[in-house]
Amino acid sequence: MCGIIGLFDIQNEEKMRQEALKMVRKIRHRGPDWSGSYSAKNCVLMHERLSIVDVEHGAQPLYDTKNQRVLAVNGEIYNHKKVAKNLKNSHDWKTHSDCEVLLYLYDEFGSDFLNDLDGIFAFCLYDPKTKDYFIARDHIGIVPLYIGWDKNGVTYVASEMKSIEAYCEKLQEFP
């Protein structure tokens, strides 16, 4: 069990980073092994890690250095080695994490790879070049994920509702 926080379409990076730090404290119990963060002009990602696969090198958020995409995941991709064999291009793998494959699947297939995954997961992927973000979770919804919006159009995503409920006008379980 890990914990993730994602804030998208933000206006004030420094202010929202500070708010995200408050949010992530509420889910710190989900990941005692590592706290990681990423912030940019339009996005903040936070991750609380419970180490299961690649204990030494799987710290998140994960980065695709070629495309500059960033990924925060709560979950486990059981068939990560199998789906990695479907990749046609060479990629600069940084870890042995089962989740890193999501960056490269997105690179090659866009969002059309979810049906190929066997696992339990919820993730936020951000592309700073296009300012696009991709949020998904496993088909059954085993891994919890919540999404909400504030009056300024900021999108909030979190592993636990309690971390974002004070910020959102509308809040729901991620479909």
Regions found by a protein language model. Give the residues of each.
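Cysteine-centered catalytic environments shared across enzyme families
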Residues: 1-175
